[in-house]
């Protein structure tokens, strides 16, 4: 999938499934681990790799998409299912197994140039192709970023000891 994320960028970004670009697996796992640690979530690189393996198998979800610009890996985003043990823990309005946008990451040098938008758009398209009619996410730091892109806050809760906003967008 080719996306032109911003008029200021002359060449296009290429968005691909991680399973089709296995050479980037270790870097993506490192980014996931790094972001978990930044957010105060207990993690290990081995655990991130173990979980990411599920994203490159034949199942439809979980999946990770990567962004390549000028032949270089610059970002990623994941689609995952979080299972709930009871309907009381499920966000109000969620279906039984909602798809969540997770692990959005763009290298700092490439931020604020439309690459994050391109990754989100590609993830939304992928989820829509699977028959999903909405995506969910939890955000701590960048709630405004998502709200400007049509996401709505459904509730606020605590996750891994941090206050987060649970958000949803229709597809």
Language model regions located:
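Conserved N-terminal entry element of GNAT/NAT acetyltransferase domains
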Residues: 1-27
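Conserved acetyl-CoA pyrophosphate-binding loop and the N-cap/start of the following alpha-helix
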Residues: 110, 114-122
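Conserved acetyl-CoA-binding loop of GNAT-fold acetyltransferases
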Residues: 147-157
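Conserved beta-strand in the GNAT
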Residues: 64-66, 72-82, 87-90, 100, ...
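C-terminal "cap" of GNAT-fold acetyltransferases
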Residues: 133, 137-142, 155-171
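Helix-loop element at the rim of GNAT/NAT acetyltransferase active sites that forms part
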Residues: 29-43
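Active-site rim helix/loop that mediates acceptor-substrate recognition in acyltransferases
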Residues: 40-69
């Amino acid at each position: 999938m080719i996306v032109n994320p911003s008029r200021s960028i002359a060449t296009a970004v290429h968005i691909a499934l991680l399973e089709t670009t296995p050479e980037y697996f270790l870097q993506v796992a490192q980014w996931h681990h790094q972001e978990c640690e930044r957010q105060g979530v207990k993690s290990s690189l081995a655990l991130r790799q173990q979980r990411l393996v599920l994203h490159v198998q034949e199942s439809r979800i979980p999946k990770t998409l990567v962004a390549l610009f000028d032949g270089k890996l610059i970002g990623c985003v994941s689609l995952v299912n979080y299972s709930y043990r009871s309907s009381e823990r499920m966000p109000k309005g969620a279906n039984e197994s909602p798809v969540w946008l997770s692990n959005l990451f763009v290298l700092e040098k490439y931020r604020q140039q439309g690459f994050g938008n391109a990754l989100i758009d590609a993830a939304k398209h992928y989820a829509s192709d699977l028959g999903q009619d909405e995506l969910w996410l939890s955000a701590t730091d960048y709630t405004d970023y998502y709200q400007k892109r049509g996401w709505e806050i459904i509730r606020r809760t605590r996750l891994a000891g941090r206050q987060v906003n649970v958000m949803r967008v229709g597809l």
